[in-house]
Amino acid sequence: MQELFITADDRTGALEIGGIVANTQFSVPVGPEAKSDICCVVDTCSRHLHPEEAKRIVFEKHLREARFHCHKIDSGLRGNWPYEIEALNELGHDVALIPSYPDAGRRCDGGVVYIQDVPVLESPFGQDPLTAPCSSRPDEVI
């Protein structure tokens, strides 16, 4: 059984989390159909899809046997992450939502996600024409 299976909603997120995990001294395949006995990251390409389609894809990918399942969301809360998290819940996986990447100036404080000390909705992420977040507070969305 695979130790760690990770999905990400876009290629940059997949490469980002793959690089972080690879820093733990083992190789991490990244791609749409990546496979490994230890850990791999699969890019679901789901950020710009209809929410139900994104949920279906994440659900199907996470049918794979693994000790731990993770889904990397956008730290600016863009995309279909609420639906993708719902897929993990429906599969019986415990979910911890951690919308932060402090090294890039993205953090969650008091339940509000900040980009360079600006609430995400007031940041450039909040102006994304395709996948802007609907709140700076993830708990208001899920």
Enumerate the language-model features and the residues they cover:
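Cap/lid and interdomain-hinge subdomains that line or gate substrate/regulatory clefts
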Residues: 1-5, 25-31, 53-54, 62-69, ...
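N-terminal signal-anchor module of multipass membrane proteins
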Residues: 2-21
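Active-site flanking residues adjacent to catalytic metal/cofactor-binding acidic residues
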Residues: 8, 42, 99
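Short, glycine-/Ser/Thr-/acidic-enriched flexible segments
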Residues: 11-13, 45-47, 102
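Conserved protein kinase catalytic core
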Residues: 15, 49, 78
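N-terminal glycine-rich anion-binding loops that anchor highly charged ligand groups
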Residues: 26-43
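Short, structured active-site "lid" loops
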Residues: 39-57
